[in-house]
Amino acid sequence: RSMIEACGMTDLAYDHEHVGPALYNHPNDFACTMLPAPGKWNHPDYRTTIDTYADYRRALRIVKVVSGNRNLRRPFTYEEICNALEHKSVINPILCIPSVSKGHGTGHLRRCLNLAIKNLADVYIPTDANLSELDSLVEKMEMEGLEKWQIISEFPTSKEYSLIITDYFSIPKQLIKDLSTLSPVASIDEGSSFTQYCDYLLDIIPSAKLNRVANLSNPGFIPLPKTRKSKDDALVENNKVLVSIGGEDPANLSLPISIALAECNKNVTVISANPLELRKQIPDDLLKNIRIVPPVNNLKERLYMYDIVVTHYGFTAFEALAAGCGVLLMETTSLHGVLAHKYGFALL
């Protein structure tokens, strides 16, 4: 009854939205007794109201932290909610920004999507992204735990995220300049000359000479395979060859190298984003030596099955070495060629 009366006594939007103030802000009309909540309910520093889109996304993280991959049909307990509010992803949300432009390969996007799954981070993919494998790769990662809401297409606002991570190879000046005004920025393997806008530089893949010093350079962060060749396996003839020149193969080298290897009587497995299209371009007499497969999930754990891995300079090259394979690199760009030569890889 008091609430009904209060509704007709105020025109203030704040009173109507929050309800309670319509009572306790008008002591001449209503008597309110403020009782302290029991300790387990009394957390004045926690905020669970949703007033902005950022608040909504924060609530989604809370739900994900509590429920994990389960579809809970019961109310959350206060302990679960309080514990979730202390989770790192809720306190300090992270945004990953990969390169999603045609010709840059899929490695940058893969790395950011994996970071998002493991750290409940968001991934910024603009609406004009033209990476051909974008949709299929995101769908595959959704099967591994990525939530649809973790992909955002709107540019972040100031202080919306505690940290922005870029994985761009060579980020445009205006983009990194804009990001630096919104949040601290950490850049992975950044090759541009605009690193003065970055707060932290992490170099993982050994690079060509750069006119700057990273905060940390450590190839130990390359995710090496657990499954490796035995010494006996390493002594067999080099007949089984894997061709994997990036998820995008921007230089279209998979076809000619596969044909050349098949002509040398090698048993070739080639990874292609468009297996049927690639198959049409292979001479009929060579099809018996060439097997075409779509992108392989967790490829690094299958590299040991091959004697030689043909790829370009990047994670797969180091993973193949660790797996005990012979490695042959293709010069997909001049920079890839320089890097392959600098670090002692066999190069075509």
Residue ranges: model-predicted function:
Residues 304-315, 325-326:
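Acidic donor-binding loop of glycosyltransferase active sites
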Residues 113, 303, 321-322:
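Short alpha-helix at the nucleotide-sugar/activated-sugar donor binding site of glycosyltransferases
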Residues 1-47, 57-68:
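Conserved core of the sugar-phosphate nucleotidyltransferase
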Residues 96-118, 127-215:
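Active-site and donor-binding regions of nucleotide-sugar-utilizing enzymes
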Residues 77-79, 197-252, 273-274, 278:
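A nucleotide-sugar donor-handling region in carbohydrate enzymes
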Residues 317-348:
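Catalytic binding pocket for nucleotide-activated donors in carbohydrate/polymer assembly enzymes
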Residues 122-130, 269-274:
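Short internal beta-strands
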Residues 239-306:
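Donor-nucleotide binding loops and adjacent catalytic segments primarily
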